[in-house]
Amino acid sequence: MKRTYQPSVISRKRTHGFRVRMKTRGGRAVIRARRAKGRAKLSV
């Protein structure tokens, strides 16, 4: 059986990257929440 997680840098960046997050209001909220929490990594 094939596993569900098949890593790919491109698809990872395109869905969870910083620039993608900044495009939408919800994505910006995610970045803001992670900054407030003090995360070292804000996005992938």
Curated annotation (Swiss-Prot):
Name the Gene Ontology molecular function terms of this record. Answer: structural constituent of ribosome
Which Gene Ontology cellular component terms are annotated?
Answer: ribonucleoprotein complex; ribosome
A Pfam family (short name) is: Ribosomal_L34
Q: Does the keyword Ribonucleoprotein apply?
A: yes
Could you tell me which PROSITE patterns the record lists for this protein? RIBOSOMAL_L34
Q: Which family does it belong to?
A: Belongs to the bacterial ribosomal protein bL34 family.
Q: What is this protein called?
A: Large ribosomal subunit protein bL34
* Organism expressing this protein natively: Nitrosomonas europaea (strain ATCC 19718 / CIP 103999 / KCTC 2705 / NBRC 14298)
| Lineage of producing organism | Bacteria, Pseudomonadati, Pseudomonadota, Betaproteobacteria, Nitrosomonadales
